[in-house]
């Protein structure tokens, strides 16, 4: 912990030297940390958290951590700790209900063996200006389906939380048949995406589907973009079919826009959306090209990875310990103050509206600016607007929304039989909207 605090002070000094400081680095005491059953990082020196099934070896980190119970491919959790030292870290697994409250199942009901894994795979960064330790661990196999939380903590003290990360294990007991349709709303026809679907369950019995079945539809792997309160419009028990067709926009998502992108896979030249690179003895810094609002602009198709990011270097194939951490500068030209707060969001920061993701207004340039520390790679991002007095952000404010946007949707089906203590995951389906392969 002492080494960590020393590094934080040094890093804050680098932030001051390199320009605007928009956030402070904090290390909470163990007694001040509260377990969050969502993707969350409790200390700012821990960064670049990835959880994925190792399926092919080629950009596996883009794989969704939703896996079948019978899958042989391991789930991999990896992350970095900034600084020259390392910590003794442990992993445990928590089973959750469909609403992500902690279930009443005991550990022995969902896990074989002791629920504490020491993370012994740790490597120091090689040749980087900002040092870090890379951690990697294979998650233990679970015995039952459901929502799960991977929890990392320090030195066998479960209250000294480091990070939490969600994953799901399912059994394909039902078939999900989705169908994208034009929105039934006249005003939403060109801005929203409507998803009807049917659930077929020929090989199982479902009792009281309206009360026992829960479906979650998730946009672009985001837990802050879900619909989870749908009930079947028709229940056809004779053919074991649930029909989810609606006419009051219950199953409509704003299409949003394609994600903005940038690449720091090299600091030897200006890569995608990079305006300027500055190399100093102790750090490297990049400045993204100035962004503007794309609201009220016509839809334009360009490739993205649905909000995700990939750690990568052009000069080497080693992703874990050779990419450096780079001060990355975002600038949004709003032509003046806006009536609220401005954030940059993406999978790289769990779409968190936090001080670390907030852009501050710079009266000298009449723009909103943010400097943050990110590992080299290829990133997707958006700008989110938080109106004064609101707790709900609005990405359409800066990005616009189009029915033609290419998005990925997950359908997750839960079932709690009568008398059961928790929810089973009995089906999963992922689809790409508007033509992305």
Functional labels for PLM-detected ranges:
Residues 42-93, 188-199, 315-330:
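Contiguous beta-strand segments within globular domains
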